[in-house]
């Protein structure tokens, strides 16, 4: 056990984390050169295309150190994006140390800080590494100062490396062996293991990535899952090198996979504890918390016939993604679909893209919303995740919205524009710190202002230099109202929004104008109205397509023409009362992009 090292890598998106992992695998001979592909551990197509890691992965390598001893290195690859921070915290809790990888040209970014603090809070040993040292723009001295000033980790002896060329890889492995402590644990104690991640395999059922804390798990051992008390027989255990390799057992301190014919992913929740069925541990490991979605959106199949297929696709995705929560939703405008909860906007995009790509579905997505609290006059608190769930006739004492604390890191030339953006989004400045050329801004912002287009605008006004990380703070009383959109006097439930009263008139007008351009002309007039309660705040018409019914009247009496026009008018009126307006997908997306 003293020769085991469990470690994780903390890095911002695109700072070279997955490439360093590839070099480790190559250096320790995990795969032959022929089998090596770029970013071995990013197994989903979408991960490779976007160049990001979404699911946690793991690999076990044997490393012959300079002191001639062989060490078992268990490396757990983690996602870098703010939406997947729960996956990061679970992966970190299975390790004794973490490599902090920072791009030597870009310096420290907000996401790195957040994950690094998580690691330090859990008592991990952090080993700094400067990657991309061979870039012409690399400035290692500045970055070392930044790591020490911003994060507070000793970095003067950081390893200089270039994952692309393979420089410094052996030095990093030596640092892991020297600095990261060996795991603690007792092989004779009752079994205790942490589920780091779970995914579904069509043939094997649920495969769980686990870190054994105490005891030893062998095949045919009977185990128990702590949170639901269910018992299972272990079919197979083993390690990833990075291909799956069967072993006889997993001992205390080791990381590997476990298959126990568990039928669905809820049977092995991520972050939960596994123990022996007969000789059980008395209490579970700390830190398990069910994942709470923060952003909700309605997703509907464009064709009603796809509903069953959509439901099955969601159930399959849910097998691999414990953070995904959904419930059926019925909309007058869009028919049957699901209200789905996500960790954040990137998570939402990825889920929608996977549904469309892997399951061949055409979907319409409504504007994302967050969870609000409503206090009624009787003192009862409701939580709602959709504007259509707001009780219209009940008296609301106060409306509360979720507030987040955002930590924004940016170069000093863009501070002005970012402060303006935060003020526009109803932000309250809490702190501002200048560190060399970097500035750290801390703002409290309403989450629903961030959900729409905050990230996109932050990136565009700072030319991509700003990075941001946020955490949920509290619910706070706010003057919010429900804005409804009516098409031909019929409210469209999926277009309703919850917004601040001060923005309502401006946003209502803007939305109506945008929809006027996007709704195609019909055979009858289409009226678009924005209203708050019974008060109409904006209105616009999409003119009808008309046939020239008087074309064949040459000269003659005016009453003949009028008779034809009146007949057309009556027909249009009747058509309008029975006609349905087809709303294209762009209209729902327009709700997302109102400034």
Swiss-Prot record:
SS bond partners: none
Function field: Required for accurate and efficient protein synthesis under certain stress conditions. May act as a fidelity factor of the translation reaction, by catalyzing a one-codon backward translocation of tRNAs on improperly translocated ribosomes. Back-translocation proceeds from a post-translocation (POST) complex to a pre-translocation (PRE) complex, thus giving elongation factor G a second chance to translocate the tRNAs correctly. Binds to ribosomes in a GTP-dependent manner.
Domain of life: Bacteria
Class in the EC hierarchy, top level: hydrolase
Binding site for GTP: 14-19, 131-134
Gene3D superfamilies: 3.30.70.240, Elongation factor 4, C-terminal domain (3.30.70.2570), Elongation Factor G (Translational Gtpase), domain 3 (3.30.70.870), P-loop containing nucleotide triphosphate hydrolases (3.40.50.300), Translation factors (2.40.30.10)
Sequence ranges assigned to domain tr-type G in this UniProt record: 2-184
Membrane topology value: Peripheral membrane protein
EC number: 3.6.5.n1
GO molecular function, one term: guanosine tetraphosphate binding
Signal peptide annotation: none
Gene: lepA
Organism: Ruthia magnifica subsp. Calyptogena magnifica
Record-linked InterPro entries: EF-4, EFG_III/V, EFG_V-like, EFTu-like_2, G_TR_CS, LepA_C_sf, LepA_CTD, LepA_IV
Key words, A-Z: Cell inner membrane, Cell membrane, GTP-binding, Hydrolase, Membrane, Nucleotide-binding, Protein biosynthesis
Lyase is among the record's keywords: no
GO CC aspect terms: plasma membrane
Pfam family, one: GTP_EFTU_D2
Localisation: Cell inner membrane
PANTHER family: TRANSLATION FACTOR GUF1 HOMOLOG, CHLOROPLASTIC, TRANSLATION FACTOR GUF1-RELATED
GO terms classed as biological process: positive regulation of translation
Swiss-Prot/TrEMBL catalytic activity: GTP + H2O = GDP + phosphate + H(+)
NCBIfam families (alphabetical): lepA (TIGR01393), small_GTP (TIGR00231)
Protein name, entry field: Elongation factor 4
Stated family: Belongs to the TRAFAC class translation factor GTPase superfamily. Classic translation factor GTPase family. LepA subfamily.
